[in-house]
Each structure stands twice: as C-alpha cells, then as structure tokens.
Amino acid sequence: MPMYQVKPYHEGSGSLRVELPTCMYRLPNVHGRTGSPAPSADHVQEASDPSLQALESHQDDILKRLYELKAAVDGLSKMIQTPDADLDVTNIIQADEPAALSTSTVDLNAMLGQDHGALKDIVINANPASPPLSLLVLHRLLCDHYKVLSSVHTHSAVRSVPANLLQCFGEQTRQQPRHEYQLGFTLIWKDVPKTQMKFSVQTMCPIEGEGNIARFLFSLFGQKQDAVNLTLIDSWVDIAIFQLKEGSSKEKAAVFRSMNSALGKTPWLVGDELTVADVVLWSVLRQTGGCGGMAPANVQKWMQACENLAPFHTALKLLQ
C-alpha cells in the first residue's frame, strides 16, 4: 500500500505549457502525455540498484561485527570489575602460549635506544621508609638475564639508612670495565613521596610509582602475552597499588576474594608463568602486612610459591 498518492494539480485534457528556466537537469513533463495510463502508485518500489544492495549488505556486516566486539568488551569489563565474575574469555580471543621468562630476552638497543657505547643506566630514587620490594625482585631477575652493573647510594638529605638497605644488592665487586656491562642499575635512597625512575633525560620523562616502574623493568625480559592477558596484568597491577595498598578494608577484602578465585584456576595470577602482576602484588602484601591469617588459602599458597624463588626470598630479608 503506497504511503501517499499525488493528485494532478490542474484539470482539463489540454496540455499545460510551463515556461521552465534553464536548469542543469531537465525532466519530461509527466502531465504532457495523453492517452497513456497514469503512473502506477507503486512506482517507487522498483528494483534497487545492485551496487546499493551490495553497500547495504556491507553495512549490515560491519554492524554485526561491531555488536560482536561490543559484547566482547562488555564481557571483559565485567570480568575485571567484578571480583567473583566467572567468565571464560578463551571463547572471545584465542590465547597464545606466553614465552617463558627464563628463556626470552629483548634487544636492549631496540628497547632503550642506541647510546653509542655508553652504558644504559637506570636510576631509581626510593624512600627507605617504604622500600619498593618489587623493584628489588626485578633487579635480581634482570641480573639473571643481563650483565648488570649495580650500585646503591644515599642522598645527602637522608640522615640514616638501615645497613640491610645499603646492602640490598649484595656485595658489589666490580671486576669488569664499565663498558662490558649491558645495563646499569643505580638505586638512590632519597626522601621522595613516590618511587621515581630516570633513564634518559633526552628521550623519556621520569616514571613515577612502583607499579609503573615495575611494568617498565619487566618489559625488558621480552615476555610475550596476548591482548587479554596484558589487560589482566595491567588490571592486577592497578588493583595492587590503588585498592590493596591505598584502599579501604572492604576493597582489600574484595581483592583477596578476586585473587583467591584466580589462583584457584592457575598457579600464578595470570596463566602459568610469573608476571609483573605477581611481583607487584606480592610486594604490596609484604609492605602492608596483609599476608597474615586473613589471606585465603590459595593466596597463602601463592605467597609461599613466590618466596620459594630466590629473588623474592632475598628481597624479603630486607623486612627482617
């Protein structure tokens, strides 16, 4: 049934002469024809152009893919924000096997830039009142991957630093020329509100916060992760800093429930390999003393697994 029907605007059988101005497109006068039937009322329902049909089909495909992507993002958001959510993301994105931490390294020149023979020196300012245990763990792991020239200093504004913090890197006996090392790691005990890292004044800004510095240092191991795992790792690091370390008691209880659920499925927080999420969460738990009797069984088992590793065990001695 047509939406509307146009009636003739004049009566009579005689043709109507209309003076038309000069225009770009001229159309035949539909009222000038005689003896022919009136145009069909459903003339607007003619067959569509094939190119238009193809365009509409392509648009439908794009909308369908957008709906699927939106559903995937909504599912990931629910899983990250809800501690007790049980969502199987393997159906959303096929996860690749992560590279083993002990066997993969990266080209430091590609990661940190070519310094034409100069030693790549990472300088970290940390407050001795709150030693960043995660960075000490990562330092030990870096020493297992690269030739690291380590040194510890005390800023002149700091009156005293415990002896164990001054020896946090162990006895440093430099037996090789400086240029034969691959990486420099300098720790300065300084009265700063947040842990700071400076690498290259010319090419990068200082990085602040234990979690952000840990992310940078862990990237030097070259561990490969898929997009889903990378999102989960970043989420765990943020949870450690903003909820477990600075949050209320309810937020901390929610973090423990979420950790207990994740560790009930895999030995580490994200998959079967140690990640920066494990390092930072372990560090925050030890700094805040939140690993006592209130921790669930899976979390306590995970804590013990961390401290069975030499880098964690060495860092733990600094709190004794």
Curated annotation (Swiss-Prot):
Post-translational modification: Phosphorylated on serine residues in response to UV irradiation.
Locations listed in the record: Cytoplasm, Cytosol; Nucleus
Listed GO MF terms: molecular adaptor activity
CDD domains per UniProt: GST_C_AIMP2 (cd03200)
GO biological process, alphabetically ordered: apoptotic process; negative regulation of cell population proliferation; positive regulation of protein ubiquitination; protein ubiquitination; protein-containing complex assembly; translation; type II pneumocyte differentiation
Domain of life: Eukaryota
Ranges where the GST C-terminal domain occurs: 220-317
This protein's record includes keyword Cytoplasm: yes
Short name of one Pfam family: Thioredoxin_16
Phosphoserine modified-residue sites: 36
Annotated region (Interaction with PRKN), positions in chain: 82-162
Keyword terms: Apoptosis, Cytoplasm, Developmental protein, Differentiation, Nucleus, Phosphoprotein, Protein biosynthesis, Ubl conjugation
Gene3D superfamilies on file: 1.20.1050.130
UniProt region (Interaction with TP53), positions on chain: 162-225
Oligomer status and interactors: Part of the multisynthetase complex (MSC), a multisubunit complex that groups tRNA ligases for Arg (RARS1), Asp (DARS1), Gln (QARS1), Ile (IARS1), Leu (LARS1), Lys (KARS1), Met (MARS1) the bifunctional ligase for Glu and Pro (EPRS1) and the auxiliary subunits AIMP1/p43, AIMP2/p38 and EEF1E1/p18. Interacts (via N-terminus) with KARS1. Interacts with EPRS1. Forms a linear complex that contains MARS1, EEF1E1, EPRS1 and AIMP2 that is at the core of the multisubunit complex. Binds FUBP1 (via C-terminus).
This protein's name: Aminoacyl tRNA synthase complex-interacting multifunctional protein 2
Organism from which the protein derives: Bos taurus
